[in-house]
Amino acid sequence: MNAPVWWQQLLLAMTGGALGSGLRFAIGASLIQRFGNVFPWGTLTVNLLGSFVAGVLLVWLDARGPSSWPLRALLIVGVIGGLTTFSSLMMECLVFARTDRSTMIGIYLAVTLLAGLALVFAGARTGQWLVTR
């Protein structure tokens, strides 16, 4: 990849990351306001939403070929990367452990991983449907 293209994709990823992080903050704050902070609904929601959308985008953009690389940088690396959060998932598991709710760790991880996997595959099927329309 030549330098101008690399810089272009870096700027697209950074722009998308800012948008995704802002979205994560807004979704998380909204869910805390609605449901309280007893369970990390915000992180679960953004990670599951991101899994589905990543599946859609990966298949849809893959069908567009190499010309889709700028969109991949913006949408997958940037927006979805900024929206989803592995570190928050891990910190929330630590909070569960430190507040004597260790049994929640397994439940939270299982729901996140199993539902995330199901949603990324559902997203891929949706993306394939969009491509073949």
Curated annotation (Swiss-Prot):
Spans traversing the lipid bilayer: 12-32, 41-61, 76-96, 104-124
InterPro entries: FluC (IPR003691)
UniProt-annotated location(s): Cell inner membrane
Activity regulation (UniProt): Na(+) is not transported, but it plays an essential structural role and its presence is essential for fluoride channel function.
A single Gene Ontology CC term: plasma membrane
GO terms for MF: fluoride channel activity; metal ion binding
Membrane topology designation: Multi-pass membrane protein
UniProt keyword terms in alphabetical order: Cell inner membrane, Cell membrane, Ion channel, Ion transport, Membrane, Metal-binding, Sodium, Transmembrane, Transmembrane helix, Transport
Pfam families associated with the record: CRCB (PF02537)
Cited HAMAP family: FluC
Similarity comment text for this entry: Belongs to the fluoride channel Fluc/FEX (TC 1.A.43) family.
Role summary: Fluoride-specific ion channel. Important for reducing fluoride concentration in the cell, thus reducing its toxicity.
Name this polypeptide is given: Fluoride-specific ion channel FluC
Classification of source organism: Bacteria, Pseudomonadati, Pseudomonadota, Gammaproteobacteria, Lysobacterales
